[in-house]
Amino acid sequence: MTTKTTMTEHVAAYLAERSMLGFSISGPGAQLLKSFAGFADGQDCGTLTSDLVIHWAKDQSRTSHPFTWAGRLAIVKPFAAYMTRLDPATEFPATPIFGKSRRRLTPHIYTDGEILGLLAAARALQPQGELRSAVFETLIGLIAATGLRISEAINLRCCDVDIEACCATVRMTKFQKSRHVPFHRSVAEALGSYLQVRGRFVRQEAEQAFFTVAGGQYLNKRTVHGVFQRLRAAVGIVPRGSYPHVRIHDLRHTFICRRLERWQAEGCDIDNAIAALSTYVGHAKVSDTYWYMTGIPDLMAIAGSRFEGFALGENGHV
């Protein structure tokens, strides 16, 4: 007699296939998918149905909010597509019955004065003139100047930063891809100054962490966030976005917004510019970059003004 394959076994096979294709299977999404499989097996349901997945998404959630339920449905959706290859009777809700599964909150956009204040506060970290102050001043400056993710910056190795070529190589990023990130000569000069300080405390080796405070070890992300919050408090920066706290990641948002603001003001071909910027900052989808045009009030105002000019025949393009 043939033994029926359980939903847990189907999920394990699906995750193994995703892993072979280079996708991460260790995040919260994988754990939620395993939770769904366990629930389905407990219901003795051999087939994935709309009723089953809705029941799990809503009634098995710890949060009574449609946004959370929609997110749980979104986790199962790719797996449901996979299951249709194995079981034609597989069902999944055809419409987003709980609404959108993703929402983007407006980030804090730093002023130039706030960024300069953060750099000055980092430079004043005790003991002054030591590696710690140089690390945090340079780290904050690099993220502000290039829009790197914090994880990308702290995972740089010495061999990844080519100061002469003004380019950093970011390896195996958030989406398991690598990319080159060119930077301005002024950034190269700041990085070179940092390396001179670093060299007094740590021997430079190609495979060592570029940003390090002890023994060539990589910075801990939690430590970086903790130090940043102390610097933010020292400067007196208060949040202007939708988040309750100002974050170091907002430096990345600020870089993207300032670049788009400049291109908008200069009347550039914004579609081509956004495509290039999306690649530069490592967005998985160009739509993630377009979001800033509608999600940031300052950019919306510029875009609206340009569209008004276009409608009145003052501009050749929007």
Spans of features found by a protein language model:
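Conserved catalytic core of the tyrosine transesterase superfamily
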Residues: 1-318
